[in-house]
Each structure stands twice: as structure tokens, then as C-alpha cells.
């Protein structure tokens, strides 16, 4: 009985927490993704429209096709892959959004291995 009462008291508090999902705000624009590799900060800048993403990393530019699965998930496929690894499609999933950023999860299509990151929108 006590467990039921505690659960009923906590339920309204849990329902107040809503994860923001304004994925449509991030379908197009210019973005920045910062991360660390062996303690060294790396930055990737990319621009995305509804069907193409152009990414620049360490002075090199790559272009990928985008296939939107739904408003928060899309698949990236490099247009000019340079090796077998780059031929593999990458599934991207926006998990939460804020006004100018989003947290996402990504991995090679068909693989259970996933990574997470945060992207900042720098312009429309």
C-alpha cells in the first residue's frame, strides 16, 4: 500500500519532465560538432539542406546524401567514398533539442555500436 502511495505521489513529478524534440528546427542550416580524440579537441563544421550534407574536417570537405526516416532520424551516405568504411551508411538520431543545439546518437547502419555527441547550430 505504501509503495502505491509513493508511486502516485511521484507520478505527477515525472510527467513534468518533457524531453524537447524540435527536430524540424535542425533539418537545415550550418552546424558545428566539437569532440575530443585522445585529449585533442577536434571540430567538424557542416551545412545541411533537406537532401545533402557538406562536412568540413581538418581542411577536407566531404558530401553526403541525406535520407530522412522521420523528423528526428536520417541516414547519411557519402557520395564519393574513398574506402570500404566510408561506403557504409550512418544512421543519425536526434535525441533531444534545445534552442541552438541537439544531442544525437549515431552508428553504422546494421551495427549495435552507437556513439553520442552534441551539435550546435551556428546559422540558418
Regions found by a protein language model. Give the residues of each.
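An anionic, turn-rich surface loop/hairpin at beta-sheet edges
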Residues: 76-99
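Short, exposed beta-strand-loop hairpins at the edges of beta-sheets
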Residues: 55, 103-116
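Positively charged n-region of N-terminal signal peptides that target proteins for export
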Residues: 1-4
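C-terminal motif of bacterial Sec signal peptides marking the signal peptidase cleavage site
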Residues: 13-15
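Tryptophan-anchored aromatic micro-motifs
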Residues: 23-39
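A short, structured loop/turn motif at beta-sheet edges
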Residues: 65-73, 94-101, 121-124
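N-terminal glycine/threonine-rich, aromatic-flanked beta-hairpin/loop signature
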Residues: 42-69
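Bacterial signal peptide processing site
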Residues: 17-19
Amino acid at each position: 500500500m505504501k509503495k502505491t502511495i509513493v508511486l502516485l505521489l511521484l507520478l505527477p513529478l515525472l510527467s513534468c519532465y518533457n524531453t524537447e524534440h524540435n527536430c524540424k528546427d535542425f533539418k537545415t542550416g550550418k552546424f558545428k560538432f566539437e569532440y575530443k580524440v585522445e585529449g585533442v579537441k577536434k571540430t567538424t563544421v557542416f551545412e545541411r539542406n533537406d537532401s545533402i550534407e557538406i562536412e568540413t574536417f581538418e581542411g577536407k570537405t566531404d558530401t553526403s546524401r541525406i535520407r530522412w526516416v522521420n523528423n528526428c532520424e536520417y541516414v547519411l551516405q557519402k557520395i564519393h567514398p574513398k574506402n570500404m568504411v566510408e561506403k557504409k551508411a550512418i544512421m543519425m538520431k536526434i535525441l533531444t533539442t534545445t534552442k541552438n543545439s541537439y544531442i544525437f546518437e549515431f552508428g553504422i547502419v546494421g551495427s549495435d555500436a552507437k556513439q553520442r555527441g552534441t551539435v550546435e547550430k551556428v546559422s540558418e
